[in-house]
A protein has these predicted regions:
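Long, well-ordered, tryptophan-enriched scaffold segments
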Residues: 86-231
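Non-catalytic terminal/interface segments that mediate subunit docking, oligomerization
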Residues: 189-287
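Acidic, glycine-rich active-site loops and adjacent beta-strand->loop/helix elements
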Residues: 54-60, 82-88, 164, 191, ...
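Cofactor-binding active-site loop characterized by glycine-rich and histidine/acidic residues
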Residues: 1-74, 227, 243-250, 258-259
């Protein structure tokens, strides 16, 4: 079984499948790994595409931002797909965003942009004109384009696109493959889409035990408390006993057993996102 002794891992393992090209765990590692693959391809002179997929939750990890920063500097060609199923980064998909995504990837637009900048730089006071144009463009993009953060880092941003729109995703992938340097495609998805129990309780189905397909309920309800249940009870009691006790979690409040503590002592509960290094040092500072 999955995630059971003697069974399959919950994460990619090369020894388990030839389709798993990288051993990893937890989250926030895909951009770093993808960048490494892309650079190795360039060093060896090979020719293949590299695509890294990362979720909006995993993007909160510091390692992901370190990789984005390095990717922008190295300018290796590879595609990053941001699977955003929590709408935590931008608003809903809109017609304007779709229009901008298509317009900005057109060859005519990219060629025109390069020609205009080259021409202006050759004119008297051209550099000042370019500077003013860039400032105006930046201000407009801040208002209209949800991916301005990535653009400022030096990574081409495409999207957002509806995750259920296969044609739209294929179109952006084809366009991204012709752009030099790292490209991020922002895909908006709905966790559990098409399966009502998962749509109602997405967190419960993040990592689940065997369940009945019709009801979504566990097939074998647990009788005994597990480690997480016991930890949850102990933390609640400690919080009751001592007002100096705080709880810090690196995302996944339910999985770490801190939901009850959070509900009872919200002012003493801190979810720092998937940022384990920060969580440890932050906790040390709190102590």
């Amino acid at each position: 079984g999955l995630r059971k002794y003697g069974g399959m891992s919950g994460f990619p393992k090369r020894k388990e499948s030839e389709c798993d090209c990288f051993d990893t765990g937890h989250s926030s590692t895909s951009i770093s790994a993808g960048l490494g693959y892309a650079l190795a391809r360039e060093i060896t002179g090979e020719d293949y595409k590299v695509v890294s997929v990362i979720g909006d939750g995993a993007l909160t990890g510091g390692m992901a931002f370190e990789a984005l920063n390095n990717a922008a500097r190295l300018k290796s060609n590879f595609i990053i797909i941001l699977n955003d199923n929590n709408m935590s980064i931008s608003e809903n998909v809109g017609g304007l965003s779709s229009y901008l995504a298509g317009f900005r990837t057109a060859d005519a637009y990219l060629d025109l942009k390069l020609n205009v900048l080259n021409s202006l730089n050759k004119m008297p006071y051209g550099e000042k004109m370019v500077s003013k144009i860039r400032k105006t463009k930046s201000g407009i993009k801040q208002l209209l384009i949800p991916g301005m953060f990535f653009e400022e880092m030096g990574i081409v941003y495409l999207g957002p696109v509806d995750g259920g729109d296969l044609h739209g995703i294929v179109k952006l992938l084809r366009e991204a493959s012709h752009i030099d340097g790292p490209v991020l495609i922002h895909v908006m998805t709905h966790k559990g889409a098409g399966y009502a129990p998962a749509e109602r309780h997405p967190a419960r189905f993040h990592g689940t035990e065997p369940f009945d397909i019709e009801t979504g309920l566990p097939k074998n309800p647990r009788v005994k408390a597990n480690y997480t249940d016991i930890f949850s009870t102990v933390m609640r009691k400690l919080g009751d006993r001592d007002e100096k006790v705080v709880a810090v979690t690196a995302a996944m409040t339910d999985g770490t057993g801190l939901k009850r503590f959070h509900n009872m002592f919200p002012e003493r509960f801190f979810d720092v996102g998937i940022a384990e290094q920060h969580a440890v040092t932050f906790a040390a500072g709190l102590a």
